[in-house]
Curated annotation (Swiss-Prot):
Protein name: TRPM8 channel-associated factor 3
Gene: Tcaf3
Domain Peptidase M60: start-end pairs: 533-832
Organism lineage string: Eukaryota, Metazoa, Chordata, Craniata, Vertebrata
One Gene Ontology CC term in the entry: plasma membrane
Family per similarity comment: Belongs to the TCAF family.
InterPro entries: Class_I_gatase-like, M60-like_N, Pep_M60_3, Peptidase_M60_dom, TCAF
Amino acid sequence: MATTPDAAFEALMNGVTSWNLPKEPTPSELLLTGEAAFPVMVNDKDQVLIAASFYGHGRLVVLSHESYLLHAGLAPFLLNAVSWLCPSPEAPIAVHSSLASLVKILGDSGVNAVVQPEPREALGVYCIDAYSETLTETLIRFMKNGGGLLIGGQALTWAVHHGHEKVLSSFPGNQVTSVAGVYFTDISGNRDWFKVSKEIPNLTLYVQCEDELKYDQQQLLKGMSEMDIETGPVPSQLLVHGQRAFPLGVDNSFNCFLAAARFGRGRVVLAGHESLILNQTMLPFVLNALRWLMGNQTGRIGLASEMKALKSVLPNSSFEWSETELLTNDLSVFCSCSLGKTDPKKVEEFVAEGGGLLIGAEAWMWGRRNPDSNCMTQYPNNIILKRFGVGIISQVVQRGRFPVPNPEVINYHIRRALSQYESVIHSQGSSLQEGWLNKLSQDCFYMFQMTHQRISIYDSVKEHALKMIQSQGFPSVTEQHPITKGSSQAFLLSLAYELFKSGVDRSQLLPPPTLLSPTESPMTIKISTGNDNSWVSTGLYLPEGQVAQVTLPTEATHAKLKVLIGCHIDNISQAKTYIRPPVMTYVYHLTSSQTSISWLYGGLLYIMVPDKYNQDNVSVTISGAVSAPYFRLGKTTQEEWKNLIEHSKAPWGELATDNIILTIPTVNLKVLQDPYPLLQLWDKIVKAVAKLAARPFPFQRPERIVLDKQISFGFLHSGYPIMGLIIIVEGIINEFKIRSHGVWGVTHELGHNHQKPGWTFRPHTTEALCNLWSIYVHETVLNIPRDQAHPSLNPELRKQRIKDHLNKGAPLSNWIVWTALETYLQLQEGFGWEPFIQLFANYQTLTGLPQNNEDKMNLWVKKFSEVVQKNLAPFFKAWGWPVQHAVAKSLASLPEWQENPMKMYTAESTEHTE
């Protein structure tokens, strides 16, 4: 039997070559919301007119008008439907009296059927129209127990008499089919042309049908004007993605933290943290929520252990409580923080058949602990919640007090927003509300996480997104064609990235690439334990759109090795304007012996080796990539380098020593005929950096400097790698310029990389102490005095800075950057560099270091005084440091620092006051 949607579709469409439908009846468009539901027939407007689904042990086929079940022209499909619905070939088939003529249509094709008023136990398939109000429970039970239900009808006439907004919740047919995620709507289906698909057709993004959700929102928010999340635990964001799901609490960036949904005949309320449910200030909402979740039911409310406090929070309510960890059929509502140990199918059926679910939980902590995991499908609560059209994601919302959503206003919803954007790019709709596109980019990331299981309601979203990219073309972003944040082009860039991450092949996103010739033979890189916690350069470049193969021994597939494509790791999404794509790198986990790799933008290839890596001499082989200019000090000959820069088509290359690696545009490398002297100088620079930091040399992991068109902030910033703008390239690869003008910016960032929390006093010395490395390198390696190394170190400016600080009363708030650096410069000029080196070494052996600035500063006063054997308490006090009495007393026995340079300034200050 066909048990997957694809196999089921194939069985239902076997031999069907056309849709011979009667022209007179007006069908209802069908809405699909369940994970098991899939479209079978759509028209030229992408409206679903026939759908199928699974429920319990049974199956369902829904036609959008009952006359289709009585039309002989549809006999081939009807026979397939009955065959697929029937659990066994021998099981009898019955038809409700309203469809009596269907018996003849089936009989003429050799299928026996009888008329019965309702389905019985031994029955295989039951056929009925969508208007019975007395058989709801019987039909659901029949399906759940393994029967097949063939049902047809339209809700248009019913809507006229009972109200369009009530169709999804109250139309008789929907009372049955909704449990399997299929609804009859009040929208007329177009009858002009019908597609015959060879595979499951695509769904529309959003069906614009009337619903009761506006009234649900009003009922849930009755008596509330705002949500206060200024204090208390910060909630996780929620993804509201189901058509019948809606927001209840939203911050200023459209991030939802409280939501609700209808699913089948039941209801769900979800909070991004349990505190939103258990908080006294939320009592009005909780009462509204419980009443709404109860609906017309009269059973008990089940409280899991973490929700027991609800009972005491609502002592005067009329609810009947039951403390239980188990979801049982006698409950009307179940309240919990965790559904991870509950059978997802059981929870789904509980809600589908009328139960209420109240859940409060956060996922941001789970996200921190599982950074490489898929939040929407692996976070335990989401395995269940996503079925109801909601999910908890690993991002947090803003703190604040936020007005409740206005039911009369169109609220942000991913499907509505994406559908509206689709209309905009096809010039069929007005522009999106400001800020929606930025929110949509994030939500697509989480939405696409659910598109790996062939589920129509999720896959269709990805298909629509892909068509948007294909219709508009892959966005190009350069200095000549910049893209503005929040623009349509920026959104398309983000959408393409999320689609690629979700598994869409690059060929569906990119125009055909201009292929570059790969290396003649595969290249093998040896990975050893000495490479742990680093990137290993391969000397290879993967052009955009091309595919390379990475192979490694089977025994290394559990070593957590990765391939990094590209080294420009700064995510510049928050920039106002982009001159290059916001995300330029992509990582593949090497969990199998052979991995195909590609990337939208290409890039240099690296093997990422994890911390505490313990497999030695592992061979990683790469084929299909191209050679990049790569010079390694002591290994690459000048002739090899000349050949590389002459013939390489790769746009980036690298200059490497054992201690530092420079990633430079190839066009700049072509003028560098002999990198040897330059790299020797860089090795001396980083050796000096290591010496001052009291770190072993050569480095276990070489420092990296990567130049880029655009970085996240500044023109240089620290990290691994140090990122810098291309405009500084001459100052990095021109040996003469380095020796004559220095290299302050890079050495400043190298200093940052060696700053340690134990002796860094944020925010005072964050941008001060790192300059010690700049000064040390300039004076000991480049022979450039400090007053020439940086204009801010002009002697007169230094003196004035000290005077200004003291004239203000030496407030600690003023002791930052150059003023703070001056304190350390006076110590260095008084005692030399050795005490710093010794102290930095000593700190590496200390444990239990203080965490607050005052204690950290006093420890530094004490340790520096001990190293130089001078009482430095008066010196630091003069600078405004909060020297504690106990520390000053402990240092009193040490000799006074007679040459204390602050004496001169404090004496001057005293004279002026006199």
